[in-house]
């Protein structure tokens, strides 16, 4: 079945769509959650401010969909950049310390500024950087055939802190170890942008297509 790219008014949707097609997948933009049944899997992109992205997701009824209807056994899901952030329980970008913005709660974790995680390097973290695939003896399915220390393209000042280390599928060194990818059964997230990551990004998208 085709992959639905969630169009809620943010993200470089055209680039993601073209990359999926180059990787051999069929895909369409999807605005209405009621149309999710037409698709075998979903991609949640995201660029910009976490709180603004969450609010737009909510305005377009996707938060309700993920809270009440979504089943990862039915729809494998890939969150990209801020899309990965939205998988968490809450985030502080664009919100106060006393009143964080909620997330979808699909993966136990929180979104914080990298400086609050101990990063002393210049932010945002922009450019190519090699990832460390933390397979625990088994390569996570979206990294099948992708070698450890492969370079991917990053653009971010915020990152996720997850409750369970077992859900970290890859990390990246930027002064500190930053979560580069998460996975929980059929739910995946990448901090980097596969659509901007040349052949490695296409390989990752092809793996997601094969999961779908």
Residue ranges and their predicted role:
Residues 27-38:
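Short acidic low-complexity segments
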Residues 190-212:
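Acyltransferase
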Residues 36-46:
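Short acidic/histidine-rich motifs immediately flanking catalytic phosphotransfer sites
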Residues 149, 183-187:
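Beta-strand-turn-beta hairpins that frame and shape the catalytic cleft
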Residues 176-183:
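Short, surface-exposed beta-strand/loop micro-motifs that present aromatic residues
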Residues 92-173:
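Pocket-forming structural segment of enzyme catalytic cores
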Residues 1-4:
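Extreme N-terminal starter segment of soluble prokaryotic enzymes
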